[in-house]
Amino acid sequence: MSFFQLLMKRKELIPLVVFMTVAAGGASSFAVYSLWKTDVILDRKKNPEPWETVDPTVPQKLITINQQWKPIEELQNVQRVTK
């Protein structure tokens, strides 16, 4: 008995199969889409320090609302002392 014959015999499974197929396709598409982003690194041998090439002016978040970069005074003091 093939899969399609089973679906024709039990028609109540058709919506479940459709929803599961759409969900699996969407999850796979999102996984592939996420792998093509610039902040995902698949090959660490070519670029062992990828954080050096990140542009600080380009937001890495999906949405940034009223976010301004300011240096933290305490952190700057610690960096000056440790250098």
Swiss-Prot record:
Keyword annotations:
Nucleus
Q: Which InterPro entries match?
A: B12D
The answer to whether UniProt assigns keyword Phosphoprotein to this entry is no
The Gene Ontology biological process annotation of the record reads: response to bacterium
- Tissue expression notes: Expressed mainly in stomach, placenta, small intestine and colon, as well as in normal mucosa of esophagus. Down-regulated in esophageal squamous cell carcinoma.
Main localization (coarse): nucleus
Q: Where in the cell is it found?
A: Nucleus
Q: Which domain of life is it from?
A: Eukaryota
Pfam annotation, one family:
B12D
One Gene Ontology cellular component term attached to this UniProt record is: nucleus
**Family as reported in the entry's similarity comment:** Belongs to the complex I NDUFA4 subunit family.
Its recorded name reads Normal mucosa of esophagus-specific gene 1 protein
Q: What's the source species for this entry?
A: Homo sapiens
